[in-house]
Structure formats: structure tokens, C-alpha cells
Amino acid sequence: MKGFLLLLSFMTRIPMPKTDYDEEKLGKSMKYFPVVGIIVGFILLFFCIIFNFILKNISYSAVLPLMIIVVILTDLITTGALHLDGLADTFDGIFSYRSKHKMLEIMKDSRLGSNGALALILYFLLKFILLFSLTIESREAAVYAIITYPVVSRFCSVVSCASSPYARGSGMGKTFVDNIKTCGLIVATVITLLYTIGMLFMPFILFTNYSLPMQFMIRSVLIIVIIVGLLALFAFAFSKLIERKIGGITGDTLGALLEISSLVYIFLFLVIPTFFIG
């Protein structure tokens, strides 16, 4: 529990009781990173519900863009832009096309470069467009994606930690890389699959008169398993690509992967179901 509280306080801006820092416990708690995503997902849902209630008398088409902005801003505030900072730093370093040592130096620089700025602009544009498109396609699917993408994206970070060595001799990310084991990856995988599949059945739990054809439910579970599997492969490939560039992963690349995989997840959620229609 202490390790998880440390992880939650480190990875979010959620007020937490003061806990003595323990590097080993923090590192070993990485397997529970998807649980942090569950908490973030429900925070996003909560603010969506509040915002929708406040503006319930305004037309849906007018509220939708604002709702998506609320989701993006809530995510940003909840995490303190920690992972976005990693995204910008990673793009500044990798796309400098310098030596491994120089790339790592650039990534440690707190100043925002042109590549990092471009990455952030593209990230926000893509996230808005993808969430908007998914909501137009299906409101239910959009709500599901909002409460699950924080989980799956954090699962990808766990996959990365288990896939590649740490690029530097020291650093916060090294704590997670050194302490994540195969059993930790299995725990994170089980949590992710149980949650993403379990949320499909939530309407049945909340509403006793809610029913859907069994074939539809089986197909939905299959889609989720495929998407999570593809994201795991993406995380592995991303980690190996970064490893070739700088000799391993860093805390910045973990943050970059988290944010990029959230976009890939929403994109796959738009595309993969089309192969099962008919």
C-alpha cells in the first residue's frame, strides 16, 4: 500500500497523505500503474458528468467540443503535465539527430525546443480530433474510451519498463526499470484486462433491465483484447526503437510512450470495430 501511495503521489497531483520516500517500494509499485489510470479515468468521467449537468440545456453539438477540452484539461491538471513534459523532451532529443550522449543531454534540458513544441501541438490536435470523431461515432464508446485510455496507456509504460534497460546510470525512471519483473508485468496485464473487459459489463451491474446480445458482448471482449494486445506490441516496438537510438529508455521516453499510446488506443478504438461489423 505504501508503494502505491508513493506511486500515486509521484504520478499525479492528487492530494495524498505524507509518506516517507522509499525508492525500492516505489519501483516495485510500477505493476500497479494501471490502477493509477483507473483513478484518473474516473476523475475524467466525474468532471464530464458535472460539466454535462451544468450545460444540460445547451445543444449537444455546442457542448461536445467544450466537453472534449474539459477531458483534456482535466487529464493535464490531474497528472501535472508530467508525461507531456516527457513527450516534449523525447522529441527534442530524438529528433535532434545527434549522438546518443548528446540526445540524452538535450532530453535533460528543461527548456522547450522546437521539436518538443511541435510534438505538443500535434498531440493536443490529434487528441481533440480523435475524441471528437469517436464521440460522433458513438457516445457510449467515447465514455468507455475516456475511462479506459488512462489505464491502457499506463500499462504500455509497464511493458516498456519490462522490455528495455535504462539508458542512464541514474534517474527516477531507473527505479521502475530495475524493479519491474516478469511477475510485475503479468500483474499489470491482468489488472488492465480485467478492468477494460469488466467495464464492458458495468451497465449490466448498474441496470438490471439492461441487455445486449451475447454475440455482441463476445465480439466486444475480442475487440478489447486485440486492442490491448496491439498496444503491448506497440509499446515493445517503441521501446526497442528508443533503445537503438539512445541505448535504453528513460523517464522521459516512458512519459512520451504513455501519451502517444493513449492516442493510438483511441485511434484503434475507432478503427478495429469496423472489421467486426456485419
From Swiss-Prot:
E.C. no: 2.7.8.26
Membrane spanning residue stretches: 35-55, 62-82, 116-136, 141-161, 185-205, 222-242, 257-277
Record flagged with keyword Oxidoreductase: no
Enzyme class: transferase
A GO CC annotation given for this chain: plasma membrane
Chief site of localization: membrane
Family, similarity comment: Belongs to the CobS family.
UniProt xrefs under HAMAP family: CobS
Protein name as annotated: Adenosylcobinamide-GDP ribazoletransferase
Annotated organism of origin: Fusobacterium nucleatum subsp. nucleatum (strain ATCC 25586 / DSM 15643 / BCRC 10681 / CIP 101130 / JCM 8532 / KCTC 2640 / LMG 13131 / VPI 4355)
Protein encoded by which gene: cobS
